[in-house]
Amino acid sequence: EQVTQRGVNNLSNLINLGFDTLVISSEPQSWKKILRAGFLNFTNWAKASEQAIVASTPSIAIKYNIPLILHGENPGLQLGDMKTMGRNGYDGNNLRYMNTVAGGNLEWLLDEGISEENLISFRYPSIQEFEDSNIQIVYLGWFWKDWSIINNGMYSATNGLQVRTDIVNNTGDLTNVFSLDEDWVSLNQMIKYYKFGFGRASD
């Protein structure tokens, strides 16, 4: 219900380009309760979805014995989320401490009556699980000299990425390449601006 046709087309484009792709989603009724809980508890409907996105890669890596995870941007260096900083600029193993992931704490969802069974995709693996599986997250942006939202967006657009066409006054997205799979992000960034005084345009 939430994904845009643009998002569907971009996922199809990745598959057509030859990327192995896993699509993970939550049970729809629980998902609606989870969105509501995020909004009422944190004024951030996207909190849980960010938990699921960030948790999915190490969970899959552990399941399939993949020791190396490549992430794009370092949120500490690029977005100011300093709790994610690791031993050096490319170490991403502290991603669990990202503001919206908060160490993987799901108590707030359990308190809302969401069952553990319906929170499997939101559960971030423990430090012990990381160590037992020898997992290492590496930020590509540290090594990629011209890494930027604009450069990555331009490169991707030349390879089939569909970008936003709406004006920045409506979206707050100066580049038209942020969070393209859905349009609720504009509302979330507006609320973020009202809460903290900055949003997508000034991150």
Language-model features: locations:
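Nucleotide-activated chemistry modules centered on ATP-dependent adenylation/adenylyltransferase
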Residues: 2-203
